């Protein structure tokens, strides 16, 4: 039943002869609950959501009042967030849809109504994560890679296609269309929805969650959204809210404008560095100030995209005139654009730089005119390097101690060389710092016509000067939508990119997520034989160890323009601002400034070729634009027929033996330590997305099931099969488990025998003994992708608790939703400080009385009988998370609730 507050807030406005209902935030000010003009715009969007969806049960008056008090009383309370829609990509989407199919089967098995297992909000899945760069630097690359993509993923695609017929409210954008976040920005986002609610046309802000951490890109157009794990997204699809503490909002005041030579990429990398230093994990970031009006929407989207890299839940740009201009540019309906402005102005959510600034938790100032051309690397996005410092910083990193900014090698590394004999008879020499991969990739940048056309102009000038890319550099171009192909074609710039080997290889994430494909065999052999430190330069958003390519140890993020420039140079061991890139056809040195376009050149080109007609043409038939997809043969049966012999899609074990009622929370006793890790363990480390090695537990499983090595595909593509994924948990080739000294990769010591073995093998031995497991970790545990399998795999290995110094937001939440207890060392404590070496038996004194953020007693019993006692913080951040844990996970809770209805 709706409350008095909600009923009083219900208002109407008229536009073009149509009446619309909305829930007026000003009512809260009139009732003395909030000063709306002082609230950050992102908080206003959240406040409208709880006000409109208040039902006096899940969302109550207390939630409205708590959020209205933002900025007072330390932001106490939590927000139940029910987004208006959900987006998925195929790597994380397949397991989400598998879980829905499994939930439906479980519901059927106990005689429940399977129609209760249907998305209650619109769901769009965009297939973008599966294409790999097998073929490149030739005109047939796109077709060849797409053909291979369908061959490798036919069963997965058949399953996703089945889901479009089996589930209500679910659509799939076919392969070779674009990257989910770019398709979302250019087409899916309405900015303001109008839906029929109780017979009334009701207007409200577009909000979403997505099963990809870079869902945050949509905040660039003023749509509030962020990445969640697949399990949380599934709950959202089924009408369950996400709960999180009322966030702090850090305001970033932008002034002035970007100078000549700097790009949106440079700004995004600078923001990432600044905000990582500030510490914004779990916080909202909102951009404001006079500099905002000097940023085209595409630049804002680039900055918003990288929120996971700076650690924030989102990086929000409120809707303003520039947002409406972008909607018009991308072919959105004129009447709808008019409605967006009218509604947001009526409801105090339309940004105007002349208005009074909101009051933020804290404010950071950033002068755009101070942004310089930059890269980030070699192993983390927040490690900014000015272009002018790149040569010396690379050389320093080679011999710096092994870690986030060093490789721990000695000076002799600079003397190493690898001689390459290509199959065509030509030869080349690669040395330390040479570039093996140069990729224009990732929605972070390919959604931005300024940097994409900028790269095309760099290519044009380079070709005209007679410059060429060395043969050992693997070049590729993988845009996030077909619109990019259209404007590169119409501008005449694609031919110059082709001349340099940046041919179109596919529409998808490719190199940015590790789908870089193989290097030439002769290059791989030479690099491996010499153990040569080679590099990549990519226009992506992540460069964690082992992510881009197993043989490429140093990876640098850069703008598409710099990707082209570095590809031409063939090495990162160069001062591009002062040393020549190469010799022109006239024999003269060619420098970066000779091929770098002016801001005006880029702007003029954008104005000329980026048009609404282009967007309308490319998106007019978006769900049916791929013939190979349309021809997939699928059944319309509502229950999925799981094939027990499939190595791609299996019915997961999460619901096996599920009781009607949850059990009690009980102490965890005599756990053994399976992994002891340092800082910055990423979800890539925990659950890699890339290649499956033949000698790994996952590889052996596939070989045992008669899968040829060439058909292994990637971990990411096999997330619908829990048997593969549990074997791939903690299996990243670069993860360093301190319990397996002298090894790198997924190994541990099995304490009963002292034998070093694969983590999966040890976990299964412990499971046979009935022994639970624990993981010890440092700061920022679980940073990176919103990878639910990092938590699912942890659960299936038998890990009962993780004890870390701090967590990244999404992974902590995912652990709880999979029934794994996240504990946090108290300030100033760590495994090392407490003298824990990992050989201990760990017990946790947790019981039914536990509450969020309680301190619990942890006992560590050493081999010699010595006892170490300490207290750890229970990282349940809301009461509902306590329920998730009690049920053994969120999906188990959803199933029990649906059965009880």
From Swiss-Prot:
Catalytically driven reaction(s): citrate = D-threo-isocitrate; (2S,3R)-3-hydroxybutane-1,2,3-tricarboxylate = 2-methyl-cis-aconitate + H2O
Function description: Involved in the catabolism of short chain fatty acids (SCFA) via the tricarboxylic acid (TCA)(acetyl degradation route) and probably the 2-methylcitrate cycle I (propionate degradation route). Catalyzes the reversible isomerization of citrate to isocitrate via cis-aconitate. Could catalyze the hydration of 2-methyl-cis-aconitate to yield (2R,3S)-2-methylisocitrate. The apo form of AcnA functions as a RNA-binding regulatory protein.
Protein name, UniProt field: Aconitate hydratase A
Secretion signal span: none
Pathway: Carbohydrate metabolism; tricarboxylic acid cycle; isocitrate from oxaloacetate: step 2/2; Organic acid metabolism; propanoate degradation
EC number of the protein: 4.2.1.3, 4.2.1.99
An example molecular function term from Gene Ontology annotations: 4 iron, 4 sulfur cluster binding
One Pfam family matching this protein: Aconitase
UniProt cross-references to PANTHER family, sorted A to Z: ACONITASE/IRON-RESPONSIVE ELEMENT FAMILY MEMBER (PTHR11670)
Binding site for [4Fe-4S] cluster: 443, 509, 512
Subunit architecture: Monomer.
Cofactor: [4Fe-4S] cluster
Keyword terms of this UniProt record: Iron, Iron-sulfur, Lyase, Metal-binding, RNA-binding, Tricarboxylic acid cycle
Family as reported in the entry's similarity comment: Belongs to the aconitase/IPM isomerase family.
Keyword Ribonucleoprotein assigned: no
Gene for this chain: acnA
